[in-house]
A protein has these predicted regions:
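Cytosolic, membrane-interface loops and tails of multi-pass inner-membrane proteins
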Residues: 134-162, 280-281
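Hydrophobic alpha-helical membrane segments
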Residues: 206-211, 227-241
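Terminal transmembrane helical module of multi-pass membrane proteins
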Residues: 243-281
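Membrane-interfacial loop-to-transmembrane alpha-helix junctions, especially the N-terminal start
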Residues: 195-203
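N-terminal signal-anchor transmembrane alpha helix
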Residues: 74-77, 82, 104-138
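N-terminal chloroplast transit peptides
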Residues: 1-40
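Membrane-interface loop-to-helix entry segments
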Residues: 163-178, 222-234
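Membrane-interface helix caps and helix-loop-helix hairpins in membrane proteins
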Residues: 216-225, 246-251
């Protein structure tokens, strides 16, 4: 029984890890899967079957205030959903304990599975939350978009120090995400259940949601300047999370430092891309 339960838990971990890896490789290689597009920088136009493909940076019709309001509200909803996953893991822990499933690293496998889903599959939780809201709410929160440009990211001017594409999934999935898992597990282990733990975890979940929002804004909506605002908020919330984790346990805060380092690179890259392409954003 214990072996079977452990295998089921491992299978769930592997499935979520595979989803996260697929998403990361998909984001990095999004432009590479398409044939080269016309150069829109000099006024060229192209059409799809029904609608024109707009030039770089034009895949979102909302005003800045409208887009940021929608992104912020969606991030808070997603963060609440992530907290719900953690609560479900906590509620499931006594069930596994009653079945004789041993703890792993001092934590119930149910709680560890919840950590894994939250950290590696936050965007999947966000999609689930979106699907569970009413059509009217989705209409209010979804940005107004138009078809974007194929090969958009490839065509952007980038700094000479732009990291190679293969480094991104390695840093996110091999370095950043596992150390985040260790940090959250550490915080969970050294704090009592209640508001003191809860608000720190919520701040961390908001940081994850803002990271997913940046992916949508930059890659999905093809908005460099607006993406810069979102990634700055994402970066700030990450630094805040590391600080409040460290208040409770210094090691928990330090375990978020690899992510802080990598997001520093990502934020600087977004700033550089904006500086090089702002006349066309």
């Amino acid at each position: 029984m214990k072996v079977t339960s452990s295998l089921c838990i491992f299978a769930a971990f592997a499935a979520n890890y595979a989803e996260a890896a697929t998403q990361a490789f998909g984001l990095i290689g999004e432009a590479k899967k398409h044939k080269p597009a016309p150069d829109f920088r000099h006024g060229a136009t192209a059409t799809t079957t029904n609608m024109p493909i707009v030039a770089r940076g034009g895949a979102c019709d909302d005003t800045n205030a409208a887009l940021f309001g929608k992104v912020g509200a969606s991030a808070l909803l997603q963060a609440a959903g992530l907290m719900g996953v953690l609560a479900l893991g906590k509620l499931s822990a006594p069930i596994l304990s009653g079945l004789g499933v041993p703890d792993l690293f001092g934590t119930s496998p149910a709680v560890l599975a919840a950590f894994f889903v939250v950290i590696f599959g936050s965007s999947l939780v966000g999609t689930f939350v979106d699907g569970g809201t009413s059509a009217a709410l989705n209409q209010a929160l979804d940005p107004n978009t138009t078809p974007g440009e194929r090969g958009w990211y490839e065509s952007l001017k980038k700094p000479s120090w732009n990291p190679p594409g293969w480094l991104f999934p390695i840093m996110w999935l091999v370095v950043s995400k596992p150390t985040q898992l260790a940090a959250v597990n550490r915080l969970w282990s050294v704090t009592e259940d209640g508001a003191d733990r809860g608000w720190r975890l919520f701040a961390y979940c908001v940081h994850l949601s803002l990271g997913d929002a940046w992916n949508k804004t930059f890659f999905g909506y093809q908005c460099i300047g607006r993406g810069l605002v979102v990634i700055t908020a994402f970066y700030s919330m990450l630094l805040f999370s590391a600080y409040v984790f460290g208040q409770v346990d210094p090691l928990a805060g330090k375990l978020l430092l690899p992510t802080c380092g990598w997001v520093t690179v990502a934020t600087a890259l977004n700033w550089s891309i904006y500086s090089l392409n702002k006349s066309e954003d």
